[in-house]
């Protein structure tokens, strides 16, 4: 049976209380990958996968999830500023459906609006060269996405929701 694909809060109810999560920033040419600690406090960059074919991309993601003993995925969903979903969001949902057929780990979708732009501004502020930014931006966007999701879940836990 395919893994469930749900909004973040609903996916979190399917994950065990402890266990690492994988955060993904899905691009057309690359996939930025980040992983949380088992207590879900901190997101750390793992790698940027150069996209080839879905099977190869998925095999690498599943290998990372196995190596890191993760309990779920957080996939950045590129929602338009007006709240609608465009072609990139549809492509992300299709990727999630295909990945869900290969794993039983619940997949949480998290609004990634402006994540790459925010990371780009941060890297520019740190005086990172354009060439170096191109190398690291996808992994940093995955960190940004996953950390945002972790922070939201922590806020909900603290408020008892």
Swiss-Prot record:
One Pfam family here: RuvX
InterPro entries referenced in this protein's UniProt entry, alphabetically: RNaseH-like_sf (IPR012337), YqgF (IPR005227), YqgF/RNaseH-like_dom (IPR006641), YqgF/RNaseH-like_dom_sf (IPR037027)
Cellular component, GO annotation: cytosol
Coiled coil region boundaries: none
EC number(s) stated in the UniProt entry for this protein: 3.1.-.-
An annotated Gene Ontology molecular function: nuclease activity
Record keyword Nucleus present: no
Localization, UniProt: Cytoplasm
Top-level taxon in the UniProt lineage: Bacteria
Keywords: Cytoplasm, Hydrolase, Nuclease, Ribosome biogenesis
GO biological process terms held by the UniProt record: rRNA 5'-end processing
Family in the record: Belongs to the YqgF nuclease family.
Protein purpose: Could be a nuclease involved in processing of the 5'-end of pre-16S rRNA.
Protein name: Putative pre-16S rRNA nuclease
């Amino acid at each position: 049976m395919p893994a469930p694909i749900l909004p973040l809060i609903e996916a979190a109810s399917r994950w065990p209380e402890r266990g690492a999560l994988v955060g993904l920033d899905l691009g057309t040419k690359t996939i930025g990958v980040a992983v949380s600690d088992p207590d879900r406090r901190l997101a750390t960059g793992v790698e940027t996968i150069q996209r080839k074919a879905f099977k190869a991309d998925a095999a690498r993601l599943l290998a990372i999830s196995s190596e890191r003993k993760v309990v779920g995925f957080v996939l950045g969903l590129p929602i338009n500023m007006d709240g609608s979903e465009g072609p990139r969001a549809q492509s992300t949902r299709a990727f999630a459906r295909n990945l869900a057929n290969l794993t039983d780990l619940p997949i949480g979708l998290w609004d990634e609006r402006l994540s790459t732009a925010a990371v780009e501004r941060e890297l520019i502020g740190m005086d990172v060269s354009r060439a170096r930014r191109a190398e690291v931006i996808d992994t940093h966007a995955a960190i940004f996405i996953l950390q945002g999701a972790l922070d939201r879940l922590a806020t909900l836990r603290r408020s008892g929701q």
